[in-house]
């Protein structure tokens, strides 16, 4: 009996040692808040807290006047379609981040998800109010019925479709689709258009600043999503097989086709320096390729670098670290809402 008891104790110690040393992943629940296995989440949370804003900061009064008096009929239609397309995504698609902690049950990951979800609520409210102030609500509702708008919603909601029995791989698939195409691609042609009008026509300054805030935060969300994806790759490389990459690359091609239809509609025939349907399509192709590269996948789009060169001003603004005071149009040294955070800032 003594030998048996000793044997049981030895086996128990070995079993407990195995449990302690057993590799855990981001999919395994962590009940206690400490230690924080993913301290990089704190940098993203801090960046979003430092950039807090609300739509109440803007009156849009001058924008309304400029919209009615300083734009041509063609330009007004472009703005209407562009803001409708932004509002469609912000209002109809964004609910993903609030549930990230249910699938990746770590306190720090859940916190990050809640903070990003709160930012999406701010975006939702901001664009609802902007559409109201500019008296576009009826047009917005009508535009949502258009075939190419519905097609975009359909492809952007593919992340909700189940393709894998393995719950971890299914969530990874959904996370990749949402991060790459909802956060890092779908809204950026619209951001580009609004920023272009403010830059080249000197109009819609409040709208432009709201778009800058949104643009920088969507970029930050994409960086956070890619960090989560790359963490999964480090911990569970077997999930990243050829079949998954092929599926994502196919979805990327479909994303470009859907976005191209939206671009043709939004651009409304405009052909000016730095702004045309052709330029916007090359811009979106490049964002798709960059998104894929951020998670270690190969490119899927052939990009005309000469045309893309005309969009470099947007990229320079996006990666700039200083806030631009849009009343004085000069760099300022304090950190606030429109400050961009890139990988070097965060890690």
Regions found by a protein language model. Name each.
Residues 15-347:
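Non-heme di-metal
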Residues 6-11:
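Acidic, Ala/Val/Gly-enriched low-complexity intrinsically disordered segments
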